Amino acid sequence: MSDGELVIEKGMRFDALLEQKCRDRAFGKKDRTRFLIMACVARQILDEPAKSPSIEAILDETGLSRGTFYNNFADMEAAMETVLSTFFQALWTNRPRTAPSRAGSADYDPVYEANLWYCESYETNAGLFAAFTRVAAYMPTLLRMRETMNANWVDRVISSTAKKRGRNFSEAERLTFQGELRLMVAMSIEALRERFIHCDELLSKSFPNAQAMAAGLTKIWNETIRRHL
């Protein structure tokens, strides 16, 4: 199964994307069955993130046999790990491309666009992020994957900033900048968790939607970036 085929469009729940793929004849029967199971797992997580998905509910919904489930996944934990890792992989590596006219406009801010994409995805798929927080302690591969993606994002910001200022960072400057950006990543993750999972009252009033949340985070990100220009 190729995860590279998965692109999460604006406002799309991940289970809906997986359902599209399970009906896509471009994939073989085995892959479509796997997508079907994953869609059911994702839907259960999204609808009830505090609960572990149920194999029985999947079998009832799909009409598949227990043997078919176990032919695809060793157990429910493996199915959850696959769903979450596929979601984050699609979220970070297969973002819809920005239109060239938009990217070239004077008011285009790539940091805001990245934050907006992440905030909108978080708002729509909050249950998957909540489940990640719950299971990451015993699924270290998920944690390492997110750390790698965060590190890649930090490196892209540093490279972009170096181009704007016209010279590379020294080793000491780069280390300081990396540390500050990783703090920004951690702050953003926690802020989004409080806003969209725990529905913090003050954050909800101050940032009523994903667009407002992205603007608020971007302001802090850009203040940090400007100090290194």
Which ranges hold each PLM region?
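C-terminal peripheral helix-coil segments that are non-catalytic and often amphipathic
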Residues: M1-K21, I158-K163, R182-L229
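Hydrophobic alpha-helical connector segments
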Residues: L6-V7, A78, T82, P96-T124, ...
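Amphipathic alpha-helical linker/stalk segments
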Residues: K21, D47, S52, V83-V111, ...
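Alpha-helical DNA-contacting segments of helix-turn-helix folds
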Residues: G28, R32, I45, A79-F87, ...
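Short hydrophobic clusters on alpha-helical segments that form packing/core surfaces
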Residues: T33, I37-I45, F87, L91, ...
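Helix-turn-helix
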Residues: Q44-A78, T82
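Membrane-embedded alpha-helical bundles of multi-pass transporters/translocases
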Residues: R66, Y70-N71, L84, F88-W92, ...
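Amphipathic alpha-helical packing segments from all-alpha helical-bundle domains
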Residues: T93-R95, E120-T124, A130-T133, P140-R167, ...
